[in-house]
Each structure stands twice: as C-alpha cells, then as structure tokens.
Swiss-Prot record:
PANTHER family: CHROMOSOMAL REPLICATION INITIATOR PROTEIN DNAA. It comes from the Bacteria. It comes from Pseudomonas syringae pv. syringae (strain B728a). This is Chromosomal replication initiator protein DnaA. Oligomerizes as a right-handed, spiral filament on DNA at oriC. One of its GO terms (biological process) is regulation of DNA replication.
C-alpha cells in the first residue's frame, strides 16, 4: 500500500475532524510502507491508544474505500519511521491501563486487516523492540543550588524567591507562584486534556510525556499549569531542581554567559536541572544561536531522563523561524491545545475567584460577566477585579446593574465588537460544539444547522459581504451563505426551536 494513499485518506479525515482533534491526534502520526504493509507510528502510547480507539476504524474504512478494494495490512506502532532520528517511548502513559500494557523498552503494534467497510478495533500484536535514546547517569550537581521559579514578564506578587549564581557567571532571581496549583485550576472541556497531561507529568516526572508541549492563546491557563507542575514536584521533593522561566530569560542568560566567557557554566547549569519549564517558546524564532544552544540542552535533558515542559501561542510546527529539528523534537512527547474556556467554565472560574476573594458573587452576575467577556481567563479575572473594587468603594452589593456601571467602557467596547469571530464563538458555545466544527466540511445536522445560524447572524449583524462571510467560514462560496440565510429565515417561521435559538443568540450578541 502506498504512502500516497494514506496521505489521501488523512486529508479526507482532516475535513471530517475539528482542527484541534486533527492536530493533536492525527497530525503527529508518521507513516512508511514496508512491502504490502503500512506502518503508522505514534509518538507515544497515549496517542496510540487514542487513535486506536477513536480513529482507526474510520481510517481503515477510508483506506478500504479508496484502495480499489484491496484489504490493507496496517500496523500501529510507537516510535518513528526509520528515516527519522530514534527516540524513547514514554514509560508512564496517562491511562493506567496503558501503563500496565507497555514496558519501558517496548513497542506496541496493532495489526488490522481491513475490509472495504469500517473495521472496529484491532488486535494487539506481540511487542517489538524500539530504539530508545540512551539514558545516562545524571551529572553531578553538588556545585549547584536548587532553583525553582518564574522569570516571566510579570513576576507574581506572592512567590518563593530564590537567587541562583553559577560560578560567578549566571545570577538571576526566579519566582514560583505558589498560588498556581492543580487544586485551584478550574477544569473544563477546553483544558481537560492539558490538565490531565500536566498532572501525569507532575505525579510521574521523567516517566510521563517528555516533552509536554502546551499551546494556545494568551491568558488560557498554560502558565498556571506549568506553575502547578513545578509546585507539585517541589511538594513531592523539596530538593528538586525545578526551573521555570520565560524563553527570553534563557536567551538573556546565554548572552550574559557569552559576555563573561562562561558558556560552559551556562550549559552545566541548565543541563543539571530535574525539570525545565519554559514559557512562550515562540520567542526563540529567528534567534539562531539561542536555538542551537537550546537544541543541545533539550537533547541532553531528554537523554538524562529529565522532564521538559514547553508552551507556545501556536502549534509548534506553525512557529515561523523555528528550526525544523526543534519542531521535530517537540513532537516526541505529547502536544496538547488549550482552547478558550466555554461559558460554563468561565462562570466556574468567576465563582471560584470570588470565593477565593471572599466576595459574594450571585450566579446571575457571574453569568452576565461570563457571557460578555469571552476572550480569555486573564480578561475575565480583570473584569471581576474591577467589579469587586467598584462594589467595595461604593459600599454596594454586586448586582447586574453595578456590573454595568463598573464595566461600562468594557461592555461598550464589546458591543462594538460584533465580529464574525465573535458570532462564531458565541454560536459554538450555544450549541456546545467547537469553532473548528463551524469551519469544517462536516455536513451532519448537529454541525450544519449551527453553521447556517452563524452565517445568518453574520449577515444581519455585520457589514461583511456574502463572499467575505463565506471566506471566514472555511472558504465557502457566497451562494452557500445565501442559501444558509434563506434557510434560517424559513425555519424561523416554521420551527419554534430555531426561532428561539436565533432570538437568544441575537440577544446575547447585542445586549
């Protein structure tokens, strides 16, 4: 079976899946042909199990449909194709069952002769050895002090401060925000997988997903999770060397080491940690010397069994100016998206923050704020702080009327921002689907009807032309938008549910 057939079927699957699902589970797969067999490699056991359970049946169905009736022999393995650099398989997957099924030095193979119709699960074959990155003894660290903390752009107010100096060359103050823990991280559908993966790494350092790569927009909780991992590691082992810093701090330290002719001390320092947590890795883009040094540091840490966690504002392969070899290595572990929180999670975040501040926040007031502040958690918390301050200074209870007063300028700005993006986000939340579903080519009614509603709202509430609306809905033709608008207008007359949905969405977007 040709690799081209596989790629063709993957492209068909891309059209069926939300972008986040495709990027997380299908995109990391590598494939190579071996005679009549197609070998598909997953970067770790968790991805292998998930693909086997959720997507293998559909993939086999597509391969059967487009393979001219030939029954493909497919093996799903942990590892990478032989043309790629060898790497270690994870030792402790997220699921307990997977942990029992996979040994530290094994590959799990799933073989499935597929008929032309959908095949369900595949049988697990005898594990075969996989090439692992050599594990070396940890370097001597007697000359280094433990370091934990954040050297990020905004130093948290409440933190444990530690100053670290490396033989006169490197000296900087770091902060670990003790208020960022797993216990006060509000979990929702948008961050559920990221939270679970971070907990697995924190509870089983060096034996979970390495590296763990979290990506998503600003203010969505990536940094919170990194601090939570660091706090948990130090709770389990107070002597652990956990380094949390912004990528720009790494660059600054390297520059300082070069100026002081202390690059060897720099290397020894960063390669002697138990866990390296680096925020906003996209700032390494187009910094060739920094990327070179980080590449070798990254390799040394993984070979030594030390944990690495990275974050970025975008999928690693989409970071322009970042070397391909770094992008490839970032995919060795688990890459997870953190999406904007849905309405229920935003309400839960507000209620939790109010409880921490010992402030009585009525549920309807929290719902009012959450409906209007949808961009990210940081803006949501900022709005709540303004409301609490206004309530305190005015000596009044928090009500919707007080919220309107304290957030007057912000709400006025939101009223002006009835954009197509805003409409897509609101409609997706209302129907409990993903924004990527609205942009996909899926035609099931559960997706197609909300998509038509969103198009009709975009025509009514924005000044965009039909071609412009079609373009931001996955590159659709203007006739598709016109049909959607006509269809929704008809349904508003004949379908009470659609009429009520449209009215509710219109009210949410304009009040």
């Amino acid at each position: 079976m040709s690799v081209e057939l596989w790629q063709q079927c993957v492209e068909l699957l891309r059209d069926e899946l939300p972008a986040q699902q495709f990027n997380t589970w299908i995109r990391p797969l590598q494939v190579e042909a071996e005679g009549d067999e197609l070998r598909v490699y997953a970067p770790n056991r968790f991805v292998l199990d998930w693909v086997n359970e959720k997507y293998l049946g559909r993939l086999l169905e597509l391969l059967g449909e487009h393979g001219q009736g030939m029954a493909p022999a497919l093996s799903l393995l942990i590892g990478s194709k032989r043309s790629s650099a060898p790497r270690a398989a994870p030792n402790a997957p997220l699921a307990a069952a997977a942990s029992q099924a996979l040994s530290a030095n094994s590959v799990s193979s799933v073989s499935a002769p597929a008929p032309a119709t959908a095949a369900p699960a595949a049988a697990v074959a005898t594990p075969a050895p996989v090439q692992n990155v050599a594990t070396h003894d940890e370097p001597s660290r007697d000359s280094f002090d433990p370091m934990a903390g954040a050297s990020s752009q905004q130093a948290p107010a409440r933190a444990e401060q530690r100053t670290v100096q490396v033989e006169g060359a490197l000296k900087h103050t770091s902060y670990l925000n003790r208020t960022f823990t797993f216990e006060n991280f509000v979990e929702g559908k948008s961050n559920q997988l990221a939270r679970a993966a971070a907990w697995q790494v924190a509870d089983n350092p060096k034996h979970g997903y390495n590296p763990l790569f979290l990506y998503g927009g600003v203010g969505l909780g990536k940094t919170h999770l990194m601090h939570a991992v660091g706090n948990h590691l130090l709770k389990k082992n107070p002597n652990a060397k956990v380094v949390y810093l912004h990528s720009e701090r790494f660059v600054a330290d390297m520059v300082k080491a070069l100026q002081l002719n202390a690059i060897n001390e720099f290397k020894r320092f960063y390669r002697s940690v138990d866990a390296l947590l680096i925020d906003d890795i996209q700032f390494f883009a187009r910094k060739e010397r920094s990327q070179e040094e980080f590449f070798h540091t990254f390799n040394a840490l993984l070979e030594g069994g030390q944990q690495v966690i990275l974050t970025s504002d975008r999928y690693p392969k989409e970071i322009e100016g970042l070397e391909e070899r770094l992008k490839s290595r970032f995919g060795w572990g688990l890459t997870v998206a953190v999406e904007p929180p849905e309405l229920e999670t935003r309400v839960a975040i507000l209620m939790k923050k109010a409880d921490q501040a010992k402030v009585d926040l009525p549920h309807d007031a929290a719902f009012f704020i959450a409906q209007r502040i949808r961009s990210n958690v940081r803006e949501l918390e900022g709005a709540l702080k303004r409301v609490i301050a206004h309530s305190h200074f005015m000596g009044r209870d928090i009500t919707i009327e007080l919220i309107r007063e304290s957030l007057k300028d912000l709400l006025a700005l939101q009223d002006k921002l009835v954009s197509v993006d805003n409409i897509q986000r609101t409609v997706a939340e209302y129907y409990k689907i993903k924004i990527s579903d609205l942009l996909s080519k899926r035609r099931s009614r559960s997706v197609a009807r909300p998509r038509q509603v969103a198009m009709a709202l975009s025509k009514e509430l924005t000044n965009h032309s039909l071609p412009e609306i079609g373009d931001v809905f996955g590159g659709r033709d203007h006739t598709t938008v016109l049909h959607a608008c006509r269809k929704i207008n008809e349904l508003k007359e004949s379908d009470a549910d659609i009429r009520e949905d449209y009215k509710n969405l219109l009210r949410t977007l304009t009040t």
